[in-house]
């Protein structure tokens, strides 16, 4: 994550990504505090900062993606950065609800993850799928905002694409 890694190390990661032409995966825009502190440090969001140092030039993935604005979503779409939602972790840590409908509308590949055992007591993909389906419904007050096909795609081909695997 941007907030746990020095600028120098992140720039080194970007150099390696360029050298080996490889995507980078990291926690991204998980909490409001993370985004606010990054804006204080660099004058831009974590997505914008990491893009500015070339970290996303070969695509990759951002875990969580809860606090992203339209500019962030556009960068992720253009740079082919998948967003991997971790709804149980985000609920347990009160990080917020990822705006999956806005991310989908922006044309970003979406996947579902569990995060780690310290922030998720179950590591149960079926529970994650359920929460990925129902939390946006609460956020939007719309029972149809994310349907079963969206969630199944996120849990299968969306995950494969996020990892760079063919569908």
Give names to the regions the model predicted.
Residues 67-84, 151-167:
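Short N-terminal secondary-structure initiator segments
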Residues 40-42, 89, 131:
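A short linear-motif detector with a strong N-terminal bias
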Residues 30, 87-91, 116-118:
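Short, acidic/turn-prone active-site loops that include or flank metal/cofactor-
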Residues 65, 86, 132-134:
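Generic beta-structure capping elements
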Residues 1-82, 94-110, 127:
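Histidine/acidic residue-rich metal-binding segments in metalloenzymes
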Residues 37, 75, 89, 96, ...:
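A generic "cationic amphipathic patch" detector
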């Amino acid at each position: 994550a941007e907030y746990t890694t020095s600028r120098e190390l992140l720039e080194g990661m970007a150099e390696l990504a360029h050298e080996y032409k490889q995507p980078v995966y990291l926690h991204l825009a998980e909490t409001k505090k993370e985004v606010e502190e990054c804006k204080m440090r660099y004058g831009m969001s974590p997505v914008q900062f990491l893009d500015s140092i070339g970290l996303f030039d070969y695509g990759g993935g951002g875990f969580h993606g809860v606090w992203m604005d339209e500019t962030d979503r556009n960068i992720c779409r253009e740079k082919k950065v998948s967003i991997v939602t971790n709804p149980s972790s985000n609920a347990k840590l009160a990080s917020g609800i990822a705006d999956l409908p806005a991310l989908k509308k922006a044309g970003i590949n979406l996947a579902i993850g569990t995060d780690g055992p310290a922030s998720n007591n179950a590591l149960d993909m079926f529970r994650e799928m359920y929460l990925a389906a129902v939390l946006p419904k609460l956020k939007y007050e719309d029972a149809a905002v994310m349907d079963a096909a969206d969630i199944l795609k996120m849990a299968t081909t969306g995950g494969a694409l996020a990892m760079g695997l063919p569908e």
